[in-house]
Amino acid sequence: MLLAVIALLSLAAGTTTAEIFTNTFLVRMRQPAERHVADRVALRNGFVNLGPVLDSQTEYHFVHRALPHVRSKRSVPHMRRLKVDPLVDTAIQQAGFKRVKRGYKPLSVDNLVPLYEMKNPGNPGNKDPTDPFFKYQWYLKNIGQNGGKPKLDLNVEAAWAQGVTGKNVTTAIMDDGVDYMHPDLKYNYNAKASYDFSSNDPYPYPRYTDDWFNSHGTRCAGEVAAARDNGVCGVGVAYDSKIAGIRMLDQPYMTDLIEANSMGHEPDLIDIYSASWGPTDDGKTVDGPRNATMRAIVRGVNEGRKGLGNIYVWASGDGGEEDDCNCDGYAASMWTISINSAINDGQNAHYDESCSSTLASTFSNGAKDPNTGVATTDLYGKCTTTHSGTSAAAPEAAGVFALALEANPQLTWRDIQHLTVLTSKRNSLFDAKDRFHWTMNGVGLEFNHLFGYGVLDAGAMVALAKKWKTVPPRYHCEAGSMFDTQEVTSDRSILVKIKTDACAGTEYAVNYLEHVQAVISVNATRRGDLELFLTSPMGTRSMILSRRVNDDDHRDGFTKWPFMTTHTWGEYPQGTWLLEVSFNTQTPQHGWLREWTLMLHGTKEPPYTGLSAADPHSKLAIVKKAHEERLSAI
């Protein structure tokens, strides 16, 4: 069934753009071949073998150095030459596409602070870190700095007080490189788990430019694992954890193979992969992982960490209210944890996207005062206080998850998602424009369309992780489909129902939900005016697509696009699901809903049976009670 899910999602298509082709090729052998055999095949055909794809013995990554790095047409002669080789089955020239960093702002020298400026030697009587920039790290300890709301932070001190600091956990920063010689990073750098896929060597050091463009990965790394009490910059969320650098964003175009090999690199050495990038946040792009990348992620969650599953953390996106992160196939994947941001007074940042796939939030900047940015490491051994965007939010979450994995190394990738739902806090997070309010789902869990289930609470997550019991097996139920084309107009929305028993009586039965996907094909005279809502049998209404004012598409629409919601977490899926398709516009528009498949993902058994809930007001206690009441009513 999982293979069917992968096949379905690999067909998903969104925005069509003019294709660009690179000088790299995916080459499939007729039968398994060792690396030296693939090397000979490449050499005799004028190529260089860069290595296997996802450790495969049948798929290899070839490059032709004489071809331009970027071209507008396929190189048919080179593909033909490969295909006639007796050992080669197929050869596919790699298309190039854009991936952008989230939250990067051009820097001036004024943004940067010399390494030892404001150095404050350690005070043995002070429990706080003595690092000079800790005072600026309000997201770690908010005492009201710069107009912030006291105690609106990640509550990391409660985790540190339990003796948990990220030991024996490695987080890979998939980005433009990591300055692993930075004095605040070098002792926590895991060289064995690192690689440069932009240059194909083991040294993922950033390429320096005059505009400091490639500082992004180094900044993200410091948020996770900057050392404590060394008089340098600030401190990482998990300051005793390790970081790996995976340089993969610094080439003219991204390819499926670069992404796949990055996300599948050393899955038993790397625990967490942190990504602060994605498709262009322009409010009109619909894009996501290609085939090999999808396979890499699925392999990671199923086989990584010796079968426990890798954790993929994704920045939700910086397109603001004009974009929707459910149009980003990375952030909206059920195999990733999508993280949004709030600023120091609890409101959303102006660049935050909203969507139903966001699981939780951390912190970034967005206020007028530049000192409310994220303080972290920077290039040339310097420090910054202006790291920004959801780029800054995702590594904070990775750091919190590193703390949880130290507390309980046996946590699976799904355990981390359950812990996120159960321990994140509403706190004082709010929508500055009063569009999205906190809502309770059918089993009593509060969620928000901007913030997911709230801000991560490191202390609470670590405490629950220590006593956690692994959740029951996960099943995938194709709950129903609709293939009758229906027209929707700007003055008449359509409502489509699927009634399901959630695969009851089969091996795929789902009784307690985790993720829900509505896999939809729809076209419109203006795609950006479409809105989609999914209502569960327990009455939870998720906006799975919001209006995108910049999206003028009238041709592509969405083809088998998996719109995902986490808002029904813990609910019972049996009953009638309602899909609403409408236009949000004053201009006459029309469109066609061509198909809809409802995919339910969750457990057959109650997920928290083996856990005790000491606090009757905790999320765990609330959900357990709802599940127990349901069982007693059956």
Residue ranges and their predicted role:
Residues 2-55, 80-122:
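Autoinhibitory N-terminal propeptides
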Residues 25-26, 61, 90-92, 170-174, ...:
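Structural recognition of the beta-strand scaffold that forms the well-ordered cores
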Residues 83-170, 183-188, 195, 200-201, ...:
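Protease zymogen maturation seam
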Residues 148, 156-158, 169, 176-181, ...:
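Subtilisin-like peptidase catalytic core
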Residues 175, 328-406, 410, 449:
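Extracellular S/T/G-rich loop segment that most often corresponds to the catalytic His/Ser-adjacent loop
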Residues 265, 270-274, 309-310, 329, ...:
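C-terminal subdomain of the subtilisin-like protease fold in secreted/lumenal serine endopeptidases
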Residues 317, 447-530, 592-634:
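Secreted peptidase-domain scaffold signal
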Residues 580-588:
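Short beta-strand-plus-loop segments that form exposed binding edges in beta-rich domains
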